[in-house]
């Protein structure tokens, strides 16, 4: 089963790469390194997803958002990429933003409102793009910890900060 999931992520990654202009040799080397690291991380990610979201299915990976911000008097758009959206059997969608770190998140990072606002905006515009009730969408940070002694993956829910202030 993990091999099927890894193939799915590899295929999605290849599709995204095909959209890029890789004339720059440095960029190509960086992408190869990114792919190598992703393959090392995958075996840590799947068990954590299975633990938190039994029976999940992948809705999208690296989903691009390019939505007009209609609440402002300016002609602005939000552009971003949602790392992972999964759907669980209860009909809920879960937006996961992966963050890499060496020793976990410091208290200041956990309390950084801009980091939380990013997920709030992703949720708002994801719901608008797909016409989904915001009550059916929850947001999370997936922490990919890499240290000299061990590697681990943790998923930290941001629901308490973002759902109360939905529009």
Annotate each PLM feature.
Residues 1-64, 162:
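A non-catalytic, helix-rich entry segment at domain boundaries
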Residues 6-10, 59-60, 92-97, 138, ...:
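Short, well-ordered strand-loop elements centered on a beta-strand within folded domains, enriched
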Residues 39-46, 119-123, 127:
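Generic solvent-exposed, charged/amphipathic alpha-helical segments
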Residues 57-59, 120, 135-137:
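A short, local hydrophobic-aromatic micro-motif
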Residues 60-120, 127-130:
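Non-catalytic protein-protein interaction segments used by genome-maintenance enzymes to assemble
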Residues 74, 112, 124-167:
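Metal-dependent nuclease catalytic regions and adjoining charged, substrate-binding loops involved
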